[in-house]
């Protein structure tokens, strides 16, 4: 009786609760499992979905799903409770931040949405699912909140040309996890980085150092920050400003001939560049600026030119960094004076050319005279030498003739050519003979003389004899000479001999 009464007092809800309790004590049903993620990543300020889906057999039902935060070293903190009949119940600490996903909803899906995630939400979360009739299941996941960095760029001190290694700019970014900071630029320099860690984030600072030069002025220097919480890299660009002042120069006097009296529109322009932009000032070194001259920044304009505009003009360029000066000399030309100068120049040129020509002519005359004297002296030396040789030859001939006269058998064979004309006892004056012999010492001589010279020399050899003896000696000499010739058709021809040489009638010596 009591048992039946007790059974009548239990309703279906009581029986379902009892079955859930029994399932929790007996363990999970091997037929079902929970599907979730190990790590859920969300960017700061966005909504985080905490997945928890029960996958079981058909006919199984999910009674409720309980979410709790279970950080290490701390107790479980209730987050929300989803009941199949009574709906969602959120803990007061998360009121207004925990919701169910928008419909349609699956009865087996126990996922929840955590609105507007903050860094404090990072940690581990547990999903506990109670099913019928399989029992209860649980799974854990870790929520990771990314804090995107907010980079900032700070320029360094003022850059000036001529400085050493100087800080150009520094870039700082803080986030969770630590961001990456790099530089994008065409400027040559060096970088250095340092980081600082906080409880929930880390800050990174990178510095860019360079040696300032005017070529860097106006160049971009970009800080690039990379982070997982950013859809794309963040870039901050800084334009470099390097203080400098270039050398000054003045243009307008490239053709000095254009600066003549009466010219209009003449001007001088001062060229320079710098950072900050320089200012220009014109002065005249040898006095004040002439009347009518216009100063327009870097340009100095002149009225129609006169001789009063001649002078030394100075362009003074300056900025906050430095100052420069450049000066030019203006010489306004008078066309009439220029023509006179040109005539004088031509006359001087003609005189110079004439002097040079005269010098060259004198030099030529000297060379001709010297060469003539040289050749004359050379000819005299050759003539003197020839006469000496001829004298020596004649002396040898005298000795040879004397030898022939005294001992004709000791004479070698000779060859003499004579042309017989006129008196049979005389020979032609220009006839010649050649006598070749060898001295006992082995030396040889060749002689050339006329028959008249032979007769004269023969007379000189016998000065003490009478006239009869002289004629007899002459006849004897002629006879001896005729032994070497044959008469043919009124002409004397030399007999063939190994030592004889035929000489023509011109008296050449061979």
Swiss-Prot record:
For this entry, the protein name equals Nectin-4
Domain named Ig-like C2-type: residues = 148-237, 248-331
- Cleavable signal peptide: 1-31
- UniProt keywords, alphabetically: Cell adhesion, Cell junction, Cell membrane, Disease variant, Disulfide bond, Ectodermal dysplasia, Glycoprotein, Host cell receptor for virus entry, Host-virus interaction, Immunoglobulin domain, Membrane, Receptor, Repeat, Secreted, Signal, Transmembrane, Transmembrane helix
Example of a GO cellular component annotation carried by this entry: extracellular exosome
Function according to Swiss-Prot or TrEMBL? Seems to be involved in cell adhesion through trans-homophilic and -heterophilic interactions, the latter including specifically interactions with NECTIN1. Does not act as receptor for alpha-herpesvirus entry into cells.
Q: Which domain of life is it from?
A: Eukaryota
Whichever gene encodes this chain, its name is: NECTIN4
Q: Which cysteines are joined by disulfide bonds?
A: 52-127, 171-223, 270-315
Q: Name one GO molecular function term.
A: virus receptor activity
Q: Does Transmembrane count among this protein's keywords?
A: yes
List of glycosylated residues: 281
Q: How is the quaternary structure described?
A: Self-associates. Interacts via its Ig-like V-type domain with NECTIN1 Ig-like V-type domain. Interacts via its C-terminus with AFDN. (Microbial infection) Interacts (via N-terminus) with measles virus hemagglutinin protein.
Q: Which family does it belong to?
A: Belongs to the nectin family.
> Where found?
Cell membrane; Cell junction, Adherens junction
Question: What Pfam families does the entry give?
Answer: C2-set_2, Ig_3, V-set
């Amino acid at each position: 009786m009591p048992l039946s009464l007790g059974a009548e007092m239990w309703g279906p809800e009581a029986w379902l609760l009892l079955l859930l309790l029994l399932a929790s004590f007996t363990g999970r049903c091997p037929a079902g499992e929970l599907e979730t993620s190990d790590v859920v990543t969300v960017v700061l300020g966005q909504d985080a979905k905490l997945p928890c889906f029960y996958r079981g057999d058909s006919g199984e039902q999910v009674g409720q799903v309980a979410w709790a935060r279970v950080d290490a070293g701390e107790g479980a903190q209730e987050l929300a409770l989803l009941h199949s009949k009574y709906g969602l119940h959120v803990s007061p600490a998360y009121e207004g931040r925990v919701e169910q996903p928008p419909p349609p909803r699956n009865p087996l899906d126990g996922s929840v949405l955590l609105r507007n995630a903050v860094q404090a939400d990072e940690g581990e979360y547990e999903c506990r699912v109670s099913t019928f009739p399989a029992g209860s299941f649980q799974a854990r996941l870790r929520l990771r909140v990314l804090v995107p960095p907010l980079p900032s760029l700070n320029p360094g001190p003022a850059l000036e040309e001529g400085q050493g290694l100087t800080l150009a700019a520094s870039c700082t970014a803080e986030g969770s996890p630590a961001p990456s900071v790099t530089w994008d630029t065409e400027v040559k320099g060096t970088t250095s980085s340092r980081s600082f860690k906080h409880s929930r984030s880390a800050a990174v600072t990178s510095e860019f150092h360079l040696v300032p030069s005017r070529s860097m002025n106006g160049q971009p220097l970009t800080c690039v920050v990379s982070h997982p919480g950013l859809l794309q890299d963040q870039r901050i660009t800084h334009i470099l400003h390097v203080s400098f002042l270039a050398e000054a120069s003045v243009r307008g006097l490239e053709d000095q001939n254009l600066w003549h009296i009466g010219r209009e529109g003449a001007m001088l322009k001062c060229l320079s560049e710098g950072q900050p932009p320089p200012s220009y000032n014109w002065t005249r070194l040898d006095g004040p600026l002439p009347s009518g001259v216009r100063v327009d920044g870097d340009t100095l304009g002149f009225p129609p030119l006169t001789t009063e505009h001649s002078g030394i003009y100075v362009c003074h360029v300056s900025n906050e960094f430095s100052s420069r000066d450049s000066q030019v000399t203006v010489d306004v030309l008078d066309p009439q004076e220029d023509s006179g100068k040109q005539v004088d120049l031509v006359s001087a040129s003609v005189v110079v050319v004439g002097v040079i020509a005269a010098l060259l002519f004198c030099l030529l005359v000297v060379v001709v005279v010297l060469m003539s004297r040289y050749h004359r002296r050379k000819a005299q030396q050759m003539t003197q030498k020839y006469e000496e040789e001829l004298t020596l030859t004649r002396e040898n001939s005298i000795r040879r003739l004397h030898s022939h006269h005294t001992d004709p058998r000791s004479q070698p064979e000779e060859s003499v050519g004579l042309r017989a004309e006129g008196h049979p006892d005389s020979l032609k004056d220009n006839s010649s003979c050649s006598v070749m012999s060898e001295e006992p010492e082995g030396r040889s001589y060749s002689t050339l003389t006329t028959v008249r010279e032979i007769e004269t020399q023969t007379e000189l050899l016998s000065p003490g004899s009478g006239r009869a003896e002289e004629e007899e000696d002459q006849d004897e000499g002629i006879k001896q000479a005729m032994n070497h010739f044959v008469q043919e058709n009124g002409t004397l021809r030399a007999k063939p001999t190994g030592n004889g040489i035929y000489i023509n009638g011109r008296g050449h010596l061979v």
